[in-house]
């Protein structure tokens, strides 16, 4: 086991991870990116259960599992007993009884995992692939890995998170850990989508007030599927008021980087031609997702082997 590895029973929330655990996962992800290998001779079994649509999280977990040599047990929500009314608890109870070691789960219910990890009967480890508008720890960790590769530290970095704050599990995961790591946080976006909980972690600003000062400019997707009513803004108005235009991009510091968890609404959060601009690290984020998820899986499986 690498000295950068630290065992975890579950990975469900950034609030539950210590700074030491976070840094070890980031550094282990970088080791995997640089070619470290860890073949499993006992063939642990992982099942991915996605109750919400996903491309990057779902597929990068699959690639991570393949690279680690794990056995993957396919789970298709549409053809499972979920459609007969089976609860999430009973689904995971079944997979645990079948001997599945790890379940990667995305679910629309915030904190769905609490009941699962509290159960004395369920022995499978849980990795949260996103719970509604709650937490998204693996996305946060890949974001941190991307920032760390760029700057080599977090202390004193100015990080702005802009967009649909209230509905973003990415924003909530990142604000908690970035503050603990010593970054200075700023939040921008429509006032209708930013609750007071963000004020405990940083300062509310407009994007034009902060764009030329930040080291990291992170945009968030407008999550139409989580809004109770129709669009508050037209796409054009939102982009003009809150998105990354060419003029705003030109105001970024020479050393600043642009991030977005994706999927991207092009010409809404970010102008289409800027998604792959020189300061963009969006593709690198996707790449890093595979390696940090390898580190997460390795750490969870190490915990199981130690018990």
From Swiss-Prot:
Top-level taxon of origin: Bacteria
Gene, per the UniProt record: pyrB
Enzyme Commission (EC) number: 2.1.3.2
GO biological process: 'de novo' pyrimidine nucleobase biosynthetic process; 'de novo' UMP biosynthetic process; amino acid metabolic process
Transferase keyword on record: yes
UniProt cross-references to Pfam families, sorted A to Z: OTCace, OTCace_N
Swiss-Prot/TrEMBL keywords: Pyrimidine biosynthesis, Transferase
Subunit field text: Heterododecamer (2C3:3R2) of six catalytic PyrB chains organized as two trimers (C3), and six regulatory PyrI chains organized as three dimers (R2).
Entry annotated with the keyword Kinase: no
Purpose of the protein: Catalyzes the condensation of carbamoyl phosphate and aspartate to form carbamoyl aspartate and inorganic phosphate, the committed step in the de novo pyrimidine nucleotide biosynthesis pathway.
NCBIfam families the record matches: asp_carb_tr (TIGR00670), PRK00856.1 (NF002032)
Organism: Streptococcus pneumoniae (strain 70585)
Chain residues that bind carbamoyl phosphate: 56-57, 106, 136, 139, 262-263
Reactions the enzyme catalyzes: carbamoyl phosphate + L-aspartate = N-carbamoyl-L-aspartate + phosphate + H(+)
Family designation: Belongs to the aspartate/ornithine carbamoyltransferase superfamily. ATCase family.
GO cellular component: cytosol
Gene Ontology molecular-function annotations: amino acid binding; aspartate carbamoyltransferase activity
Pathway the protein takes part in: Pyrimidine metabolism; UMP biosynthesis via de novo pathway; (S)-dihydroorotate from bicarbonate: step 2/3
Positions of L-aspartate binding: 84, 169, 221
InterPro entries, A to Z: Asp/Orn_carbamoyltranf_P-bd, Asp/Orn_carbamoylTrfase, Asp/Orn_carbamoylTrfase_sf, Asp_carbamoyltransf, Asp_carbamoyltransf_Asp/Orn-bd
Protein name: Aspartate carbamoyltransferase catalytic subunit
């Amino acid at each position: 086991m690498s000295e950068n590895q630290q065992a975890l029973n579950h990975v469900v929330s950034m609030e539950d991870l210590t700074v030491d655990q976070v840094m070890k996962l980031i550094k282990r992800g970088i080791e995997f990116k640089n070619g470290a290998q860890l073949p499993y001779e006992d063939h642990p079994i992982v099942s991915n259960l996605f109750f919400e649509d996903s491309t990057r999280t779902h597929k990068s977990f699959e690639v991570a599992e393949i690279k680690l040599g794990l056995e993957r047990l396919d789970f298709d929500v549409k053809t499972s007993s979920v459609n007969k009314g089976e609860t999430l608890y009973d689904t995971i109870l079944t997979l645990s009884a079948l001997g599945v070691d790890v379940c990667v789960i995305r679910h629309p219910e915030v904190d769905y995992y609490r009941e699962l990890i509290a159960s004395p009967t369920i022995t499978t480890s849980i990795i949260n692939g996103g719970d509604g508008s709650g937490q998204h720890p693996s996305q946060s960790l890949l974001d941190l890995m991307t920032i760390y590769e760029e700057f080599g530290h977090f202390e004193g970095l100015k990080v702005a998170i802009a967009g649909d704050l209230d509905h973003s599990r990415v924003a909530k995961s990142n604000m908690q850990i970035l503050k603990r790591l010593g970054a200075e946080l700023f939040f921008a976006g429509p006032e209708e989508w930013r609750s007071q909980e963000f004020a405990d972690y940083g300062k509310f600003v407009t994007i034009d007030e902060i764009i030329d000062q930040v080291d990291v400019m992170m945009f968030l997707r407008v999550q139409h599927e989580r809004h109770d009513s129709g669009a508050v803004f037209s796409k054009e108005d939102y982009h003009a008021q809150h998105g990354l235009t060419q003029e705003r991009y030109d105001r970024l510091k020479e050393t600043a980087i642009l991030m977005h968890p994706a999927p991207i609404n092009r010409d809404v959060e970010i102008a289409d031609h800027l998604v792959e601009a020189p300061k963009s690290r969006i593709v690198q984020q996707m790449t890093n997702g595979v390696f940090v998820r390898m580190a997460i899986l390795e750490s969870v499986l190490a915990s199981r082997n130690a018990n």
